């Protein structure tokens, strides 16, 4: 079942992020709690999860960003697309991305964007199959410390 994350599912989400790029689950600090609270109460920040048999197996983040161009239409940024390795290839992440797409449409977004750090062809194929292309724009990243 695809839905938005519940407040009591932070630990489950952090465990899932171990399949993304995290090396360990962060310690439950005041900063982490405040960040979680900020995310949960931001109407433009959507933490989407796919639950199978009571377990969160896939997730993505969809942030709706207000915009003054394109006829004052917002755009959506997708981040942290991840699926538990044991559940990959079954459409769970695609379902999360489709949920994000519906949220973006409901918000009248004119586009959705995502970046991937992967250089694997199967990752590119996955995103192309989900409706994304890498030909229209060029991304530049500046990492901040």
Predicted regions and their residues:
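Conserved beta-strand-loop-alpha-helix junction that forms the acyl-donor binding cleft
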Residues: 113-123, 141, 145
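Conserved acetyl-CoA-binding loop-helix of GNAT-fold acetyltransferases
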Residues: 80-83, 89-102, 129
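Conserved glycine-rich acetyl-CoA-binding loop
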Residues: 71, 84-95, 107, 119-124
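Conserved beta-strand in the GNAT
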Residues: 49, 55-64, 77, 82
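Conserved GNAT acetyl-CoA-binding A-motif
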Residues: 97, 104-116
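Conserved GNAT-fold acetyl-CoA-binding loop/helix
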Residues: 14-37
């Amino acid at each position: 079942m695809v839905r938005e994350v519940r407040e009591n599912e932070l630990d489950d989400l952090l465990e899932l992020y171990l399949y993304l790029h995290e090396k360990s689950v962060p310690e439950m600090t005041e900063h982490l709690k405040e960040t979680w609270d900020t995310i949960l109460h931001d109407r433009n920040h959507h933490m989407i999860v796919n639950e199978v048999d009571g377990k969160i197996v896939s997730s993505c983040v969809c942030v709706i960003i207000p915009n003054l161009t394109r006829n004052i239409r917002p755009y959506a940024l997708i981040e942290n697309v991840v699926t538990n390795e044991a559940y990959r290839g079954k459409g769970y992440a695609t379902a999360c991305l489709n949920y994000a797409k519906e949220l973006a449409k409901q918000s009248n977004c004119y586009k959705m964007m995502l970046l991937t750090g992967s250089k694997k062809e199967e990752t590119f194929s996955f995103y192309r199959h989900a409706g994304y292309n890498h030909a229209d724009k060029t991304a530049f990243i500046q990492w901040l410390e």
